Amino acid sequence: LINRIVKCFTRSSPPKKIKYDIEVMNYFHFKGKRRLAQHWQRRILYKYGCDIEPGVKIHSSCIFPHPVGITLGKNVVIDENVKIHQNVTIGSSPLKSGKELMPKIEKNVTIFAGAVIAGDLTISHGAIIGANAVISRDIQAKSTVVTAKPTILT
């Protein structure tokens, strides 16, 4: 833990620092130190503009190339070698059954800027989620999801 806290204050790049901050926040969360976990959550929010809930399960190989504006819900599961770009939201859909149903992101997935992934769904391994895509159902392995073609209205 001390090693991770020290790394949070070093001169390493923001993509590395945010991972250390998340690890420290989750350490406090899973040890039952709620106030310390909330302090670290606010630190992440102020430092990077990212709203990451304590309890998110992120593999250590996950990459945040531009850690700005990312929102991750409490029980989101993110496997190894996932790349999450800026302004991505991963969380629950509106409550239907009274439980928050969170997405699971499998390994080797790339999520580009502005994507929204919501609900009880799985993004299977090797999938690519394009910029500004809105995902509300399961995505098959090695699929590419993009938004529709832009339409000029005037």
Q: Residue ranges of each PLM-predicted region?
A:
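Terminal amphipathic alpha-helical/low-complexity segments used for targeting or macromolecular assembly
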Residues: L1-G49, T151
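Left-handed beta-helix
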Residues: Y48, P54, H59-S60, P65-V68, ...
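Hydrophobic beta-strand-centered segment that forms part of the acyl-chain substrate-binding groove
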Residues: S97
